[in-house]
Regions:
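Non-catalytic terminal accessory segments
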Residues: 1-128
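Soluble catalytic domains of enzymes that build or remodel membrane lipids, polysaccharides, and related
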Residues: 144-387
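N-terminal active-site segment of His-dependent metallophosphoesterases
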Residues: 7-25, 30, 41, 67, ...
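Contiguous N-terminal and early-domain "leader" segments and peripheral loops that mark the onset or edge
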Residues: 105, 117-129, 134, 239-247, ...
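Generic structural motif
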Residues: 86, 93, 100, 140-142, ...
């Protein structure tokens, strides 16, 4: 079914590309460069379409086991070549609503096409930037010894489609220079398999914080997007991911909790496995992670999916701060708005109900396309203060 879906997508993209090329050839190329120019244009773009299609089909027919990065770049190639043409086509067709046919929509279409091309290229560059955000969370429940406590929060690296050890090193260097008391990672280390971590193990092992590094699993970490030969193979992959994080010096909180002590005070660090709505599996169990959800201890929760906050955390606990990821802001954020808000009302940034807070980090990595239109990769410094 997955293979059929990808092949159908390739066919649809081919049809769109063909129609756009025919239209652009007849509207722009042939009138300006003649029949010979039009023929050369169609041949060059025909080769481009064929090359992308063959690569995409080979990757899809390979069962997608090790082909996701290839398919991502095939999709990006189509975007770069044909989104501008599609924009031009849709806008310039408005000229045909007038008799005799006008030209203004064609000029506007060219401007829109140029803008779309610039946005795609710019979003590719932006995916390798780092936006360090600082927020303050105030609470009357915070113990005095933890006044000014610094949490550095990051999320959603998706190592399979990160493509750059140099960028991973920059992220680690950025975090280490922020003087963290604790580092929190809210899931989706890998895209599909634990082997993705091998290439970056030495870099991520360099992270340092006074009170340690704590993480949870995201929906991608379980290997549920891979067709495994057996349940044993899937479990072995997951176990290996657990082991690698432990070897890096990270503490993976799988429906578990611990306490951090300063002087005579302490706070709780709680982590749940992925809590997700269908089609994602429901692994998270808040009560198992911390049975005394209404005790007087100041509590930090790490949970991958921000919907967990309203669904279970607010109604069933007095947890002070939950940190999540997952949304990526749909890798699109313009003037503080992301279309992912239609799915996740709390999609990025700080939210609160009284003195209960949620922070959603929009992540480091990418899925589907290697682009971030706005939605710059994020590292967050959360400073705890008494209210």
């Amino acid at each position: 079914m997955q293979l059929l879906f990808h092949l159908t997508g390739i066919v649809v993209l081919l049809l769109i590309a063909l129609l756009c090329n025919i239209y652009v050839t007849r509207r722009i190329i042939k009138p300006r460069f003649g029949k010979r120019g039009a023929t050369i244009y169609m041949l060059v773009h025909g080769v481009a379409i064929a090359t992308l299609s063959v690569i995409g089909c080979i990757a899809s027919l390979g069962g997608l086991e090790d082909s996701i990065p290839t398919l991502v770049w095939v999709m990006y190639g189509f975007m770069l070549l044909y989104v501008p043409k599609l924009c031009y086509t849709l806008v310039s067709l408005l000229d045909y609503l007038k008799r005799p046919r006008g030209h203004m929509a064609g000029y506007v279409g060219m401007a829109v096409a140029a803008l779309s091309f610039a946005l795609i290229v710019g979003s590719t560059i932006n995916r390798y930037r780092i936006d360090t955000k600082e927020v303050v969370v105030k609470s009357s429940r915070l113990p005095k010894s933890f006044e000014g406590y610094r949490i550095v929060h990051f999320s959603d690296i998706h190592l399979e489609t990160l493509y750059s050890r140099a960028y991973a090193q920059r992220v680690v260097n950025c975090i280490n220079t922020l003087n963290p008391d604790i580092i929190v990672y809210s899931g989706d280390m890998v895209n599909r398999k634990s082997t993705e971590l091998d290439k970056y193990f030495d870099i991520l092992s360099q992270l340092k914080a006074r009170d340690g590094i704590y993480s949870v699993l995201g929906n991608h970490d379980y290997g549920d997007f891979v067709k495994w030969a057996s349940d044993e193979a899937r479990q072995a992959n997951l176990t290996r991911l657990h082991q690698l994080q432990a070897e890096m010096g990270w503490t993976l909180l799988n429906n578990a909790s611990t306490h951090i002590h300063r002087d005579n005070d302490s706070i709780a660090i709680i982590g749940v496995e992925n809590w997700g709505e269908p089609p994602f599996q429901q692994y998270g169990d808040l009560n198992e992670a911390y049975p005394h959800l209404y005790d007087e201890t100041y509590k930090l929760l790490i949970s991958h999916n921000p919907r967990h906050w309203r669904a279970e955390v607010l109604p069933n606990s007095n947890i002070d701060l939950m940190m999540a990821g997952h949304t990526h802001a749909l890798q699109t954020e313009i003037c503080g708005y992301s279309p992912v808000k239609a799915i996740y009302p709390e999609w990025g940034g700080l939210y609160n109900e009284g003195e209960q807070f949620l922070y959603v980090n929009i992540g480091i990595g990418c899925t589907m396309t290697p682009t971030r239109l706005g939605a710059t990769p994020e590292v967050t410094v959360i400073t705890l203060k008494s209210n």
